Amino acid sequence: MGCSLYPQGYPAIVNQLRDFKGTNLLADIGNGTMNILYINNKKAQESRCWTEKLGVNQCMIAAKNAVLDKFGVKIEESTVEQILRFGTADISAPYLDCISSIARQYVAELFSTLRKYEYNPDLMRLYVVGGGGCLIRNFGTYDKSRVTIIDDICATAKGYESLAYM
């Protein structure tokens, strides 16, 4: 019996590899970290794989602190989560604007970090898995034809299943 090891996020896209051409970048944006992996001609480049402490929780903390600093009140984490996941919540506009501004800054930081690792949307496609995809979709400025957000929460499990039968 053998054991296979795969870079973080890779199983989530394994069923889509047939569509990959040229250079692609995978960003797995989870709660605590963003894992970055280059995939060239359908092959993971393990030597071009990095982890940044830039997970969704950093955005959550920043949003809650911004509301506390600006309005002097604590906001429920579930309310902030609603905004981050769906882009809105049933709260007054000043609070929504405050949190949305933080989310836009966070997404800008995500893209800045990707550029640090030579991400160029003109030269490659970006695939995003994990909870951070919601933030990019709701608060990011990007070319939708060059960025694929995989929001299937079962994508990783499906990928591992496929890998088990390869």
Label each PLM-derived region with a short phrase.
Residues L54-E76:
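Conserved ATP-utilizing enzyme core subdomain
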